[in-house]
Amino acid sequence: MALNKKLISLLLLIFIILNIVNSHQQEDCDDDDEDIGISAERSERRSVKNSNDGSNFYNLNDYYTPENWNYYSGSFATKDCRDASYITIPLGTTGGLDEGNLSSFLLTKKGSNLFIALDAGTVWQGVRRLTTFKYFNTLFNITYPSWAVLPEQRTSWFLKNHVMSYFIGHSHLDHVGGLILVSPEDYLAKNWIDVQPPINNGIMGLIRKLGFKPTDFTSSSILQKKTIMGLPSTINSISTNLFNNQVWPNLPSFGRYQYFSLASGIEYPFTELVPYNATTMSLVANEFPFSVKVKPFELCHDNLISTSFLFTDSISGEQIAFFSDTGVPSSVACDWEGKIYAVWKQIKIDKLKAIYIETSFPNNTPDSAMFGHLRPRDVMKLMDQLLVQSIQTSPPMTNLKHVKLIIEHIKPQVAEDPNGWTTQRVIYQQLKEANNNGVRIIIPNQGDPICI
């Protein structure tokens, strides 16, 4: 009888322990569902600074599940940000289908909270995800009006006050749809100049730094026009076919936006692409984005003209190359490789920080189904040529280990895959296998910063 009592007591104790363990596991799952940033335990072990100096970005493990992060390269861990100059934030990373995650990136410099957009397929959803990550607002010194407490209120304010300009590579909807949809909220009304307590960062901070006063805006209801930049064919398509009072209200005509048509192969100081005079711009000439020059290049995108934007820092000489859609044509003849090599010839290889380029399909996709897109084998052939075609050092550089290759426009995996892999995983594996030059492959995740 005594033995039976001991056995019953032991079984009861085991039952209680199992229930406690199960309860804690359920709480952990609940916490994971609710917490869209890093875990509370990790956050307690980290100190947070007041600016985005790159020292407080987290390991991929903090955001990605094991199924995802184990085939991503590190992109915003402390070691990657320590020596970085720029930070880019993916607002959308896929090509077509997923309307909440289409091609768009923000770019800024460490220490700045003014951003330029590179394509604009998805804007709202990417910014909403970004602004709700823990510590983003502290790291980038984002200040909101006192009433902006809801995610949608903060998303709207970030768009108004922190996104200055849009560089649009071509006019397909998966590259401009986000800009069109957010345009009703994408402006700062002049009454915000008097908001209390005053907001001294973003575009509001810029206006104050340039010495403007409330009385300077009496003839306009908007503090600053935002700029939409692209090749003439792109600008014409946006203005004629989208902001045309039929597909969408013509908001640029109300002073929301100003178009800038850029000529292929001509370099423009950013100070010439904003609605301020040169004397005013001298006050911020060494700050981002005014310290940057941009040179657009015409690309092939099947039967449409697309664009690469080459950004050069006028102070450090560092360069970043952004490619909108381009690649193997299916319906027309076009020297798509030659046009990309024209970009390579303008790059100083030791100054190159990053390349954004699409990889829409896996290697087994036939040319007849490409329609102006790229596969991993195409991309890595281009990387081989980058070392050959670019402006070299003496002695010449023999690898691309200092360059981040940010892969964009990956089409979702809607067909059967024998391994059950996402297209991101297939493409990452194929890029890695053909990476002869050591370029640092990044498969971006919506809203997660990448130091470059």
Swiss-Prot record:
Inhibited by dithiotreitol (DTT). Induction: Up-regulated by Pseudomonas aeruginosa, PA14 strain infection but not by Pseudomonas aeruginosa, PA01 strain. It catalyses: 3',5'-cyclic AMP + H2O = AMP + H(+); 3',5'-cyclic GMP + H2O = GMP + H(+). It is an enzyme of class 3 (hydrolase). InterPro entries: cAMP-PdiesteraseII_CS, Pdiesterase2, RibonucZ/Hydroxyglut_hydro. It is found in: Secreted, Extracellular space; Cell surface. CDD domains: class_II_PDE_MBL-fold. Its EC number is 3.1.4.35, 3.1.4.53. GO terms for biological process: adenylate cyclase-inhibiting G protein-coupled receptor signaling pathway; aggregation involved in sorocarp development; cAMP catabolic process; extracellular regulation of signal transduction; negative regulation of glucose mediated signaling pathway; response to cAMP; response to catechin; response to differentiation-inducing factor 1. One of its GO terms (molecular function) is 3',5'-cyclic-GMP phosphodiesterase activity. Residues 24-49 form a propeptide. One of its GO terms (cellular component) is extracellular region. Pfam families: PDEase_II (PF02112). Glycans are attached at residues 101, 141, 277. Residues 1-23 form the signal peptide. Phosphodiesterase which displays a preference for cAMP over cGMP. Involved in the degradation of extracellular cAMP. Maintains the responsiveness of cells to the chemoattractant cAMP during the aggregation phase of development. Belongs to the cyclic nucleotide phosphodiesterase class-II family. This is cAMP/cGMP-dependent 3',5'-cAMP/cGMP phosphodiesterase A.
